[in-house]
């Protein structure tokens, strides 16, 4: 305590005060010096109490006299004050404050209700924690863990005004939490609870028409509105949802404008509308201002090209206390800025007096005035205005556009911005006091020792000096909230002997000899004037203020009493109405038209031409108080036509649109798919034809238009990670791109032409849409041999390119989310010493654009990046050496992959990295690389990609390295592969024969595919299965990846969960494709059935509720479609002329009801050229019935053993998707994951172990397992290691409980014995003593009691008598039953060792058991038994009781008994009986 007082005294010595004032002539000014910079300065409302924090050491200072004197506040953990810092109360929480968000979230109407956001860490493992209090931190309770963001429903004082909200809304809390089974942002959910999440997980908020939506990234509260932003994967576009009652939500509509992540700003709004500024498509520093209707649903454009900065701040401010006046800055040369990021913006200022409907320039006489605003604000608080009625100030200049801040002067208006005049030369900070009676300004272009002030609305100015000649650089000039006091605070910095020192200067006008204002000194001032200079109406009233006249020589002196407006009602006009629900503004901006089909009264509309009385489309803005009598009445109900109640009425028919092109064929096509959070209804397709013409369709091929006609586009590059984006490239380095699915296009210029190494020209960033790497060709114009590739990067869509590296082969951005690395992590392949002739390709990485670089490998073949792994193929030192594999998870540390010894790999020349999304990497290691004879083995890694085991041998691959391997979309762990079934013959030069294999546990076990029982015509197949299981002679085989013309034509769909379609045959091998039939499965490949004879192309639609088939390679004019998962099929004629169909397509998610056929007419009456046919199933009537979605479980199938370990559980992994239900019924379901028994998902796949034919797991002969103790060195937190068993947990499994075959015998890690025995406590010491002693004591006590009360004591002989019938008679049940039980237990314990040894001998004769007797042959005949009877072990003497021999036999019977004991056959029989028992 003494030390603390000394420190306090020392700090107060530093705070030396100076005073300089003349009581009558100017303000009283005092200065307090501080060693370190004050930060976080704020006032308590309606008081002179001010606080700030020392910017260096965090000490808190408080002043109770508006900054004249300061005291330090005693420290502690967390403190709260309820009396303006007069007293403090300490509180604690078991967490550190949040680093990413403001830690305190306040209730809008109850100051005692607060949430605290924090986190608690154990080592590197941190969990977000949210706490709450309802009594001002007297008690603190944990709300939830891992809540990403929480907020009160009632977050503002105005929320719920005018609504009769339920009481529970006052307790309601919204929290953004991670997905059920995914931590990705697109899986986030919004939950709410009215009980602080007690005894509940919370309820998902029904954001979209009563349906929960995934991907919630943030919520925000503004005035009476709550907004929630959601984002889907693979797009930057957001969906915003809004509510004004915390219960009913609506999706916002921005008049066709896109809203993107980090590209919108919610501005200061009113109680009757929201203001949102949305970034323009091509510039992050130019926006468009939107204003909503009263419920925040429909937004209309107010003004385009608003000025904003990269931090999201917008030059927008509402004039304080006056409704409807808005000051904005816009960009005059917006076209030039959007064309090039290097163009300097020309900013101009505008003002609106009608709530943003119209804008006009600011005027100083006849000159336009432009003011610096929010984007370069130099003071705290509001930029232009305060509660002082009508007074507005700003720094700027007159002329054509805004100049630099240092070139500006101070301007003032006292009529709310209608007229302006110059107040002071040069830029100044400024503040208002005493309701505008006093204005203070301080020079803001350098150091100053004076302040300026005005007492007449800025017309005349006076100066006052700072005390003792102090010269400061002004940082903050402020006053109490409300601008009603005569006291101001000025914070500034000054030069010290060493470094800087800081001053807080108190400026007090209270002691100036100014009288108190009287009634004659005030005027009734209209807040808004119309074009006729008359008081204007807004929201049904005119607004007036009683304010001091500019020339009055008095002070108002009403401390903490803000001026109150007076209102005068007006008659209703058109401006008092807005569009009603389900209506939007028409193109004229005046009418309101239906946004969707109207709802007519029941029984009214029988014909489309009938009429009914309904909404006019308008309604009075809620809160508007205009006088209806004698005014406009736009919301009067009107007569409507019944045809408006049907928008796109179901026709019950399939609609066809055919289009023709002059080209012979298409080179490629791409879908730019609209995601759930994206606006609009487009289904965009882009095609490049054989003539290099580019066509675009926004309606899935119904109508096409040619785009970029003047450009010589040679290739189209869709963005790998964002489905809205595509690039159109030429051979000279010019290019175009679209960010909005072809709605608009913008040109860019690359630094070099595309490379000539047949490598990807563009590399895309997984998370940053605008970041690109361009690999171009340099020095390639002449015939010289120095042509090489050079990489450049851009972070603004090609607006500016920066050199990255030369002599590269390929560069890639590396995803940050899975690795926790920098988003600037880039990997490049570069030729060593920038010399391609040496053939040494280095793998380098950087996190700062190669200002510094890291060398990982000096001689690689290639590298591949996946969601979780970076895999590198490394060359050996000599050409004949095999390739090695390097693996990294974090992009920094690589480890060599350990390949299994039981895979015989020759000199390794090729690896194929297969799809790896289930926490394990799949590699195809080529075994035979001879042309047309290629095959290899699939290896599967552990969770860090370093240890591999054999998954499947002899997998087919082609000469390009692609393998017949495909994972099922939508389900974890299901995959199919084609293997070479005649390996021995292939090694001798024979052609390959294929068989299809399937796995349901992510490659741990593979089986042949079970064939259907009968074909599509009801006939049995020529071969037969064995007990329903496939055999080598009879299984289903399907054509796979290497035979596809388009690799996008996969077996399965991400939304048609569980369904796969393929072409193939039933038999011993896969036959020719020309002889294939078409098959379908609905249970993820467990059972199959033949759909049709012949080979068909297929496509899924409407999340699997529609399946379309069209013949492959055969001219046709009909297709087949099914609405019940392929159980029944219907024909549909799509063309009058037969067509050769090359492909059938739909959107990649398979959620559309539109399909597109690609081909050409070949029949009679054909038209030349390429043709596309759109098939639209949208007209089919939907059923209103809902069928629940069922979790598929392989155990529900009649087959007894799907895999060696029993029935397989299949888990749906999509977090939220529209899924199919039979008969064309669309439903929406969240995923469900069944956590299986752990034994089912532990497979014999540990390093150097392999499964045996009997199902056991054994180590490969001569090989050793990985050192199990490595877990202790690799993970410092590990406390134990386990002896290897050969079993390994499948990386994707979510199983819980059950047998842990991989964790049987545990040992402590070095120096972790204490933690180990805490986890695995042993019985020892006093505990062991009592465990032994207590049973003995109980037994002795019981025995003593029974001995003294039992009538059958030792020594008594009773011949032929029964017991006495007493309680403890020996025949009493109370005695006989316990005696029997004890005797049985003793007999079992005695016999157990003998029984086990006997069983071991029996079992070891039939089952191979490693070690022991496993090597002995079972006896198959009497002779074989007799030949080895000496090896048989006799039963020891003590076994007689076990086998039932009577102890009471006399000695003469002993020999006979002993002789019987030597009869090994009888003994074996007896033992067998006991074993069965």
Swiss-Prot record:
Signal peptide start-end: 1-21
Cross-referenced InterPro entries: Sortilin_C, Sortilin_N, VPS10, VPS10-sortilin, WD40/YVTN_repeat-like_dom_sf
Annotated BNR repeat ranges: 61-71, 351-360, 411-421, 453-463, 695-705, 1079-1089, 1121-1130
Alphabetical UniProt keywords: Glycoprotein, Golgi apparatus, Membrane, Protein transport, Receptor, Repeat, Signal, Transmembrane, Transmembrane helix, Transport
Functional description taken from the UniProt entry: Functions as a sorting receptor in the Golgi compartment required for the intracellular sorting and delivery of soluble vacuolar proteins, like carboxypeptidase Y (CPY) and proteinase A. Executes multiple rounds of sorting by cycling between the late Golgi and a prevacuolar endosome-like compartment.
Cross-referenced Gene3D superfamilies: 2.10.70.80, 3.30.60.270, YVTN repeat-like/Quinoprotein amine dehydrogenase
Annotated membrane topology: Multi-pass membrane protein
Gene Ontology terms: cellular component: cytosol; Golgi apparatus; membrane
UniProt-recorded name of the protein: Vacuolar protein sorting/targeting protein 10
Lumenal topology ranges: 22-1325, 1394-1477
Stretches assigned to coiled coil: none
Pfam families in UniProt: Sortilin-Vps10 (PF15902), Sortilin_C (PF15901)
Location in the cell: Golgi apparatus, trans-Golgi network membrane; Prevacuolar compartment membrane
Disordered as annotated region, ranges: 1443-1463
SUPFAM superfamilies (alphabetical): Oligoxyloglucan reducing end-specific cellobiohydrolase
GO biological process, one term: Golgi to endosome transport
Family: Belongs to the VPS10 family.
Acidic residues: bias regions: 1443-1455
Top-level division of the source organism's lineage: Eukaryota
Cytoplasmic domain ranges by topology: 1347-1372
CDD domains tied to this protein: Sialidase_non-viral
SMART domains (UniProt xref): VPS10 (SM00602)
Principal place of residence: Golgi
């Amino acid at each position: 305590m003494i030390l603390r007082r000394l420190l306090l005294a020392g700090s107060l010595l530093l705070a030396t005060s100076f005073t300089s004032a003349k009581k009558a002539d100017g303000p009283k000014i005092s200065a307090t010096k501080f060693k370190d910079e004050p930060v976080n300065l704020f006032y308590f409302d309606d008081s002179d109490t001010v606080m700030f924090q020392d910017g260096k050491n965090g000490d808190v200072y408080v002043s109770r006299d508006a900054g004249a004197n300061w005291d330090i506040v005693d420290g502690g953990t967390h403190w709260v004050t309820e009396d303006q810092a007069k007293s403090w109360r300490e509180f604690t929480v078991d967490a550190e404050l949040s680093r990413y968000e403001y830690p305190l979230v306040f209730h809008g109407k109850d100051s005692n209700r607060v949430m605290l956001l924090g986190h608690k860490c154990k080592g590197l493992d941190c969990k977000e924690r949210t706490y709450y209090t309802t009594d001002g931190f007297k008690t603190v309770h944990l709300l939830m863990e891992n809540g990403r963001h929480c907020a009160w429903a009632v977050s503002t004082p105005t929320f719920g005004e005018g609504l009769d909200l339920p009481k529970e809304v006052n307790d309601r809390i919204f929290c953004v939490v991670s997905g059920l089974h995914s931590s990705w942002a697109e899986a986030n959910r919004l939950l709410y609870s009215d009980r602080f999440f007690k005894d509940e997980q919370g309820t998902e908020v029904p954001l979209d028409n009563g349906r929960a939506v995934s991907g919630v990234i943030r919520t925000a509260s503004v005035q009476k509105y709550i907004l929630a932003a959601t984002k889907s994967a693979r797009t930057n576009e957001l969906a915003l949802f809004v509510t004004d009652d915390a219960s009913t939500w609506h999706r916002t509509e921005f008049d066709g404008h896109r809203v993107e992540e980090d590209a919108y700003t919610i501005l200061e709004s009113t109680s009757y509308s929201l203001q949102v500024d949305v970034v323009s498509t091509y510039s992050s520093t130019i926006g468009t201002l939107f204003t909503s209707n009263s419920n925040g649903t429909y937004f209309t454009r107010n003004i385009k090209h608003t000025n904003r900065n990269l931090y999201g701040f917008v030059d927008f401010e509402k004039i304080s206390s006056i409704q409807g006046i808005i000051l904005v800055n816009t960009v005059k040369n917006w076209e030039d800025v959007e064309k090039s990021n290097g163009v300097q913006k020309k900013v101009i200022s505008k003002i609106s007096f009608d709530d943003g409907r119209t804008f006009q320039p600011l005027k100083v006489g006849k000159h336009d005035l432009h003011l610096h605003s929010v984007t370069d604000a130099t003071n705290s608080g509001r930029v232009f205005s305060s509660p002082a009625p009508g007074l507005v100030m700003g720094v700027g200049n007159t002329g054509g556009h805004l100049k630099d801040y240092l070139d500006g002067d101070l301007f003032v208006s006292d009529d709310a911005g209608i007229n302006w005049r110059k107040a002071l030369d040069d830029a100044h900070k400024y503040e208002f006091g005493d309701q505008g009676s006093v204005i203070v300004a301080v020079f803001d272009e350098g150091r100053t020792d004076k302040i300026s002030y005005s007492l007449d609305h800025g017309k005349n100015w006076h100066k006052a000096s700072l005390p003792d000649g102090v010269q400061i650089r002004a940082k903050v000039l402020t006053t109490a909230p409300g601008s009603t006091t005569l006291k101001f605070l000025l914070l500034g910095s000054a030069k010290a002997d060493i470094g800087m020192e800081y001053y807080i200067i108190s400026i007090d006008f209270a002691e100036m000899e100014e009288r108190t204002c009287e009634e004659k000194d005030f005027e009734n001032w209209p807040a808004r004037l119309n074009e006729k200079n008359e008081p204007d109406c807004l929201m049904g009233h005119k607004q007036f203020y009683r304010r001091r006249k500019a020339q009055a020589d008095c002070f108002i002196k009403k401390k903490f009493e803000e001026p109150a407006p007076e209102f005068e009602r007006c008659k209703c006009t058109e401006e008092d109405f807005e569009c009603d629900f389900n209506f939007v503004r028409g193109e004229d901006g005046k009418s309101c038209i239906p946004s969707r089909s109207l709802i007519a009264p029941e029984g009214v509309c029988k014909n489309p031409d009938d009429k009914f009385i309904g909404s006019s489309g308008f309604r009075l803005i809620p809160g508007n108080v205009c006088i209806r009598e004698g005014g406009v009445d736009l919301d009067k109900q009107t007569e409507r036509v019944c045809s408006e109640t049907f928008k796109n009425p179901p026709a019950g028919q399939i609609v066809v649109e055919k289009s023709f092109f002059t080209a012979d064929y298409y080179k490629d096509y791409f879908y730019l798919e609209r995601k759930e959070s994206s606006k609009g209804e487009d289904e965009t397709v882009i095609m490049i034809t054989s003539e290099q013409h580019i066509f675009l369709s926004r309606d899935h091929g119904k109508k096409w238009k040619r785009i970029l006609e003047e450009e010589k586009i040679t290739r189209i590059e869709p963005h790998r990670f964002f489905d809205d984006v595509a690039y159109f490239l030429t051979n000279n380095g010019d290019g175009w791109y679209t960010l909005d699915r072809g709605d608009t296009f913008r040109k860019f210029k690359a630094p070099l032409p595309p490379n000539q190494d047949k490598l990807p020209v563009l590399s895309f960033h997984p998370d940053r849409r605008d970041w690109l790497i361009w690999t171009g060709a340099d020095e390639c114009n002449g015939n010289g041999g120095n042509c090489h590739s050079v990489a450049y990067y851009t972070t603004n869509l090609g607006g500016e390119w920066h050199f990255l590296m030369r002599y590269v082969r390929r560069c890639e951005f590396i995803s940050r989310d899975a690795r926790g690395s920098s988003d600037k992590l880039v990997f490049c392949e570069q030729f060593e010493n920038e010399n391609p002739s040496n053939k040494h390709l280095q793998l380098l990485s950087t996190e700062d654009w190669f200002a510094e670089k890291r060398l990982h490998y000096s001689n690689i073949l290639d590298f591949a990046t996946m969601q979780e792994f970076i895999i590198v193929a490394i060359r050996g030192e000599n050409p004949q050496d095999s390739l090695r594999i390097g693996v990294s998870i974090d992009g920094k540390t690589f480890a060599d992959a350990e390949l299994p010894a039981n895979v015989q790999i020759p000199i390794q020349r090729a690896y194929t990295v297969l799809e790896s999304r289930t926490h394990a990497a799949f590699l195809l290691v080529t075994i035979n690389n001879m042309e047309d004879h290629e095959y290899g083995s699939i290896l599967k890694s552990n969770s860090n990609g370093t240890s591999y085991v054999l998954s499947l041998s002899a997998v087919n691959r082609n000469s390009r390295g692609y393998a017949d391997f495909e994972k099922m979309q939508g389900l974890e762990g299901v995959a199919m592969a084609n293997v070479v079934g005649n390996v021995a013959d292939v090694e001798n030069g024979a052609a390959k024969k294929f068989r299809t294999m399937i796995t349901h546990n992510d490659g741990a076990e593979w089986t042949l595919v079970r064939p259907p029982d009968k074909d599509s015509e009801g006939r049995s197949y020529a071969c037969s299965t064995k007990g329903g299981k496939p055999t080598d002679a009879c299984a289903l085989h399907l054509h796979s990846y290497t035979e596809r013309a388009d690799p996008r034509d996969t077996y399965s769909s991400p939304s048609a969960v569980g369904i796969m379609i393929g072409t193939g045959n039933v038999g011993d091998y896969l036959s020719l494709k020309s002889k294939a039939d078409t098959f379908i499965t609905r249970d993820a490949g467990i059972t199959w059935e033949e759909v049709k004879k012949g080979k068909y192309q297929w496509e899924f639609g409407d999340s699997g509720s529609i399946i379309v088939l069209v013949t492959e390679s055969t001219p046709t004019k009909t297709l087949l479609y099914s609405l019940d998962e392929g159980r029944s099929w219907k024909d549909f004629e799509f063309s009058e002329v037969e067509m050769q169909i090359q492909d059938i397509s739909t959107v990649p998610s398979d959620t559309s009801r539109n399909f597109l056929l690609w081909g050409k007419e070949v029949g009679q009456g054909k038209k030349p050229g390429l043709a596309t046919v759109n098939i639209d199933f949208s007209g089919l009537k939907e059923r209103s019935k809902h069928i629940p979605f069922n979790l598929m479980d392989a155990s529900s199938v009649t087959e007894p053993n799907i895999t060696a370990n029993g029935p397989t559980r299949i888990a749906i992994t999509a977090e939220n998707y529209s899924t199919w239900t039979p008969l064309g019924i669309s439903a929406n379901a969240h995923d469900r994951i069944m956590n299986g028994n752990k034994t089912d998902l532990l497979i014999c796949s540990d390093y150097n172990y392999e499964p045996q034919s009997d199902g056991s797991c054994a180590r490969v002969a001569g090989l050793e397992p990985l050192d199990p103790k490595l877990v202790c060195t690799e993970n410092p937190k590990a406390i134990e290691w386990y002896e290897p068993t050969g079993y390994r947990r499948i990386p994707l499994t979510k199983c819980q409980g059950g047998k842990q075959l991989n964790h049987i015998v545990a040992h402590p890690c070095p120096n972790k014995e204490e933690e180990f025995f805490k986890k695995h406590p042993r019985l020892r010491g006093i505990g062991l003593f009592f465990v032994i002693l207590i049973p003995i004591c109980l037994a002795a006590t019981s025995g003593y009691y029974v001995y003294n009360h039992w009538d059958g004591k030792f020594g008594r002989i009773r011949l032929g008598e029964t017991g006495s019938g007493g309680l403890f008679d020996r025949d009493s049940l109370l005695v006989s039953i316990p005696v029997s039980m004890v005797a049985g237990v003793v007999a079992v314990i005695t016999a157990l060792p003998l029984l086990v040894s006997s069983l071991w001998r029996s079992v070891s004769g039939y089952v191979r058991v490693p070690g022991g007797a496993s090597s002995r042959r079972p006896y198959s005949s009497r002779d074989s038994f007799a030949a080895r009877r000496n090896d048989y072990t006799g039963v020891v003497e003590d076994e007689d009781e076990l086998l039932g021999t009577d102890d009471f036999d006399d000695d003469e019977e002993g020999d006979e008994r002993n002789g019987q004991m030597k009869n090994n056959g009888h003994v074996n029989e007896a033992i067998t009986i006991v074993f069965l028992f």
